[in-house]
Amino acid sequence: YIDAETMHLHHDKHHQTYVNNANAALEKHPEIGEDLEALLADVESIPADIRQALINNGGGHLNHALFWELMTPEKTAPSAELAAAIDATFGSFEEFQAAFTAAATTRFGSGWAWLVVNKEGKLEVTSTANQDTPISEGKKPILGL
């Protein structure tokens, strides 16, 4: 459970600030385009003067956008395909939950816990600091907290 005040703070304040700051950085280099996923998948391609701003704020935007997209008022189950992949990777849904909970609760300071598809196409639980995104590590996030 996440209370309404915390949700409001993250949606209307934090996320909006990430969007505003990412847009301000992108305005300095219109030649690189606005595809944050592509840019953050290859951070070395981002001009040095805006690189950290895009890592921080672009990552914050993408992380929160996925978080909002996945949020539902009702409890939902993973698709049959994802459930099978979770069982194959972790042994059971309960073992996945334990790994995901550990990734979330052992993150020192602020950050995210993730279920990602790694470069080898396999599921993996990982954690990133602050607003770092697994996209920058060549991973596709499918669940984030």
Swiss-Prot record:
<dbReference type="InterPro" id="IPR036314">
    <property type="entry name" value="SOD_C_sf"/>
</dbReference>
<dbReference type="GO" id="GO:0004784">
    <property type="term" value="F:superoxide dismutase activity"/>
</dbReference>
<keyword id="KW-0479">Metal-binding</keyword>
<keyword id="KW-0560">Oxidoreductase</keyword>
<dbReference type="InterPro" id="IPR036324">
    <property type="entry name" value="Mn/Fe_SOD_N_sf"/>
</dbReference>
<feature type="binding site">
    <location>
        <position position="64"/>
    </location>
    <ligand>
        <name>Fe(3+)</name>
    </ligand>
</feature>
<protein>
    <recommendedName>
        <fullName>Superoxide dismutase [Mn/Fe]</fullName>
        <ecNumber>1.15.1.1</ecNumber>
    </recommendedName>
</protein>
<feature type="binding site">
    <location>
        <position position="10"/>
    </location>
    <ligand>
        <name>Mn(2+)</name>
    </ligand>
</feature>
<dbReference type="GO" id="GO:0005737">
    <property type="term" value="C:cytoplasm"/>
</dbReference>
<dbReference type="GO" id="GO:0046872">
    <property type="term" value="F:metal ion binding"/>
</dbReference>
<dbReference type="InterPro" id="IPR019831">
    <property type="entry name" value="Mn/Fe_SOD_N"/>
</dbReference>
<dbReference type="Pfam" id="PF00081">
    <property type="entry name" value="Sod_Fe_N"/>
</dbReference>
<comment type="similarity">
    <text>Belongs to the iron/manganese superoxide dismutase family.</text>
</comment>
<dbReference type="InterPro" id="IPR019832">
    <property type="entry name" value="Mn/Fe_SOD_C"/>
</dbReference>
<keyword id="KW-0464">Manganese</keyword>
<keyword id="KW-0408">Iron</keyword>
<dbReference type="InterPro" id="IPR001189">
    <property type="entry name" value="Mn/Fe_SOD"/>
</dbReference>
<dbReference type="Pfam" id="PF02777">
    <property type="entry name" value="Sod_Fe_C"/>
</dbReference>
<comment type="function">
    <text>Destroys superoxide anion radicals which are normally produced within the cells and which are toxic to biological systems. Catalyzes the dismutation of superoxide anion radicals into O2 and H2O2 by successive reduction and oxidation of the transition metal ion at the active site.</text>
</comment>
<feature type="region of interest" description="Disordered">
    <location>
        <begin position="126"/>
        <end position="145"/>
    </location>
</feature>
<feature type="binding site">
    <location>
        <position position="64"/>
    </location>
    <ligand>
        <name>Mn(2+)</name>
    </ligand>
</feature>
<feature type="binding site">
    <location>
        <position position="10"/>
    </location>
    <ligand>
        <name>Fe(3+)</name>
    </ligand>
</feature>
